[in-house]
């Protein structure tokens, strides 16, 4: 008798752990979509301020996120409506996990598109929920009739839509996403992890549409190591989410560093613009290759 094996859930035993590649030094790593350099590289005065900030951070105290000023910075820079309440996660992954936990009733379903971010399906399985995956069209566009049909048939408690989609990089038509939100009887999460690289956002709808959650992260704009995601939604959702989020899920260093970084958002935007230009350049060079 193996006492440990006997108490672990059978469905978890057959899962595969997420593997982070162990790459040699100097290897160019692109799979995680990290910024290739420190966001303040070349700004010696800001790097010095950053170091001083870390020294002064009250790491002997538990963090008080609401009093840290981070919500105000997020609202001002990203235009989050006053009607929307904000929740922070230790990366967007944590928010995905707890939003799934929030609706994990018996026989509840999660709906997503395929292919998309793997953590949607993973968390559905983790909480014993059926995951309904709706395949994209061959050109990776959204098969809206199939999605609407799946919503009507399965009545999912939670729907995830990555906007733009990950890993395909395709951004669906806004009116298609709006149609999904209108058709849903449960919560719709519009995951804008890559929203900084697109011209459109559902953040202005946050708090206005009761069943909508708009989720973003600072990871893709140069701060993957800080592990901070944020979600904006109506009080009816966020009030319930607050009951299950850990009280100290953000740490003092991440809060201080994120707030400092957001105060210098002009530099961050310059970095984003540089990445956009590089994206266009690489695409143009790839199109010159006959074998692609």
Task: Give the location of each predicted region.
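Conserved core of the PLP fold type I
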Residues: 57-183, 194-209
């Amino acid at each position: 008798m193996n006492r440990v094996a006997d108490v672990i859930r059978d469905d978890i035993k057959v899962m595969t752990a997420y593997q982070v590649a162990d790459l040699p030094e100097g290897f160019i790593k692109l799979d995680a979509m990290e910024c290739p350099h420190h966001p303040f590289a070349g700004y010696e005065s800001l790097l010095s301020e950053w170091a001083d900030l870390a020294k002064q951070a009250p790491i002997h105290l538990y963090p008080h996120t609401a009093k840290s000023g981070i919500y105000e910075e997020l609202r001002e820079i990203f235009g989050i409506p006053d009607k929307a309440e904000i929740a922070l996660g230790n990366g967007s992954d944590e928010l995905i996990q707890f939003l799934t936990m929030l609706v994990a009733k018996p026989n509840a379903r999660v709906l997503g598109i395929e292919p998309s971010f793997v953590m949607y399906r993973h968390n559905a399985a983790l909480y014993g929920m059926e995951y309904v995956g709706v395949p994209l069209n061959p050109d990776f566009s959204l098969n809206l009739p199939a999605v609407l049909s799946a919503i009507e048939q399965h009545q999912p408690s939670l729907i995830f839509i990555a906007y733009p989609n990950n890993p395909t990089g395709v951004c669906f038509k806004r009116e298609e996403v709006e149609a999904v939100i209108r058709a849903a009887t449960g919560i719709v999460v519009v995951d804008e992890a890559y929203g900084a690289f697109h011209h459109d956002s559902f953040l202005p709808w946050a708090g206005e549409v009761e069943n909508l959650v708009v989720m973003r992260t600072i990871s893709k704009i140069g701060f993957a190591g800080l592990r901070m995601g944020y979600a904006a939604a109506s009080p009816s959702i966020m009030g319930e989410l607050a009951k299950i989020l850990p009280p100290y899920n953000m740490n003092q260093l991440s809060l201080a560093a994120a707030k400092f970084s957001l105060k210098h958002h002009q530099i961050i935007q310059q970095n984003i613009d540089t990445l956009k230009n590089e994206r266009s350049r690489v695409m143009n060079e790839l199109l010159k290759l006959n074998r692609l």
